[in-house]
């Protein structure tokens, strides 16, 4: 099982210069290989096999950076091709732009060339770097690689990839379960009637973002004032992203600690984000990120996440009598049934999602437990 830990790092001036050169070399090798492969295929109809080593004689400055970072550029290009041929919607491999505000490179741990100890991280070519290690790492985990990134706000981070043994936990009897129904307004409503009460970080900052964007539009493109304002906007976006990520981590941890089984709907977030009615809410809520966090946290704890088919009519089924209500509009926020049941539409759906998850798993709920 792969586990990734992300920490902030504080490189000195020379290390920042090395990272900048490495980012540039990785981008250069990736783009060069992509261009040559495309050109060769157009001429011959065959696939060109090329490695970064080919370019070092012609471009000796490539030897100044970590060679494993260049090798990983080749692997990333191969992955991009595989993704495209497996599913064309992934898109054909594209050239990497120098203007991308987020830059990164990946290297591998070989013969102890990457070491983490005493608040410092050792990386190939860069040496020892100060790191903010805010959490401990199990000594049994094996370090396999590191990805160094520079975010749009000019802060540096490292993502350390560890390999751990697969947990041997297996759910034998589910004592606690919960269903979550995606909510545009509150992230989710659960099967006990609790609402996530999502803070909507993006919406709260929209006015400030719009103001900074207007200031940017008044700057001359390419000027120092323009670049300074652009970085200011990037820092604001990065701050919003960190707020969202922190909230979703804490919310998914709370649910994981309380429940053995979590049931959710399989929603196509890409399609929903393109809908004019949902776009901003889907982007702001981060439901896809939230379910990813839930998935790996539950897996590590030996617990279960069940995804219900997106065509399952969770909103239309009465959670009391089981009757299907065919006519139910999106604006109908209260579910009313002829049996007398009247409740919040999302809560009704969450109860049905939980029951369907239990049915799929083939277990019966022994006790109920609510998050306090």
Regions found by a protein language model. Give the residues of each.
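Nucleic-acid substrate recognition interfaces
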Residues: 1-372
